[in-house]
């Protein structure tokens, strides 16, 4: 992939900082309202990715009316833009802010801390629902020793900006030679590992029943849990009355006597995705229906 020129790097970075400066100047609720208005215009007026998104929704919810599907599409896109606003404002989201905007945040931190205190780390699987970053931001702000993986941005200045936005979350760079070693080491040290499980992977891995179809997802997160003996917490974020709700769907534990570790990781992955599937069907407007990598796209073997 071609390296960006200094002119392009600086233009992209300062354009981003200008936009961020504007978002940070206005009150939080006003910014969230503007984001929702932009989403309404994009979905209802300009029909942004409308055909593709509506086709996905119809395939998953054939029983729902067009009006209801359009509402889900709008709320899903509004959630994306509002999450972007919160990403920009992330360094300003203090613990007091979390107390006001994250329902029972301290309670869930203590619950996760109890797993960390077992000494084998914990794998936290949170899908693309609500502001999934908020799950990590809030838990880290309450003091949970948490880390995640992230891809390196092509623009080095934007990459550094992203690292600052992660705040109290330790970030392991995806794709480096030591990524897998670092993840295993941190779990063995008793850290919490946040991971997105609802991503389609290109190479055949674990086929799961999901949203009425078959999805090919990675067993990577579960494999770390199996190797380290870590519990897996499956949770979903969603928005409710202007606040963030952390729904704990279940805690899965690997079988320490399992001889086939790959099969055990596959079992855990399927169980986690089944829990997530059930929740998405209850609250579809909170899930990311606009993802370019459609999770139900068949894998070419």
Task: Show which residues each predicted segment covers.
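A conditional alpha-helix N-cap/helix-loop micro-motif detector
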Residues: 102-105, 129, 155, 173-177, ...
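Short, flexible loop segments at the rims of nucleotide/cofactor-binding pockets, characterized by
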Residues: 97-103, 169-174, 210-212, 258
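Catalytic core of membrane glycerolipid acyltransferases/transacylases, capturing the structured
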Residues: 118-176, 200-206
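Non-catalytic C-terminal accessory region of glycerolipid acyltransferases
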Residues: 3-7, 74, 114-117, 141-144, ...
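Hydrophobic alpha-helical segments typical of transmembrane helices
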Residues: 18, 30, 53-56, 158-162, ...
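Membrane-anchoring hydrophobic helices of lipid-metabolizing enzymes
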Residues: 2-126
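Soluble or luminal CAZymes and related metallo-dependent hydrolases
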Residues: 14, 49, 104, 175, ...
């Amino acid at each position: 992939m071609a390296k960006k020129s200094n002119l392009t790097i600086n233009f992209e970075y300062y354009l981003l900082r200008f936009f961020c400066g504007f978002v940070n100047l206005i009150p939080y609720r006003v910014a969230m309202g503007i984001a929702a208005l932009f989403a309404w215009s994009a979905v209802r007026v300009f029909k942004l990715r409308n055909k593709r998104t509506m086709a996905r929704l119809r395939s998953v919810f054939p029983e729902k009316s067009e009006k209801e599907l359009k509402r889900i599409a709008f709320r899903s896109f509004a959630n994306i833009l509002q999450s972007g606003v919160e990403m920009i404002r992330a360094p300003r989201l203090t613990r007091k802010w979390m107390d006001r905007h994250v329902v029972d945040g301290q309670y869930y931190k203590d619950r996760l801390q109890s797993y960390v205190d077992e000494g084998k780390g914990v794998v936290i699987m949170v899908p693309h629902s609500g502001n999934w970053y908020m799950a990590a931001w809030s838990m880290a702000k309450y003091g949970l020793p948490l880390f995640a993986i992230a891809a390196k941005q092509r623009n080095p200045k934007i990459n550094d900006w992203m690292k600052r936005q992660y705040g109290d979350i330790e970030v392991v760079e995806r794709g480096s030679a030591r990524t897998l070693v670092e993840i295993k080491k941190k779990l063995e040290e008793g850290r919490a590992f946040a991971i997105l499980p609802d991503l389609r992977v290109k190479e055949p891995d674990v086929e799961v029943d999901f949203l009425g179809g078959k999805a090919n997802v990675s067993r990577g997160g579960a494999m770390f849990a199996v190797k380290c003996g870590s519990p897996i917490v499956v949770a979903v974020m969603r928005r409710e009355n202007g606040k963030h709700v952390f729904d704990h769907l279940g805690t899965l534990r690997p079988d320490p006597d399992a001889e086939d570790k790959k099969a055990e990781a596959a079992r855990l992955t399927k169980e986690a995705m089944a829990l997530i599937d059930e929740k998405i069907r209850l609250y579809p407007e909170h899930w990311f229906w606009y993802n370019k990598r459609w999770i139900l796209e068949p894998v070419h073997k």
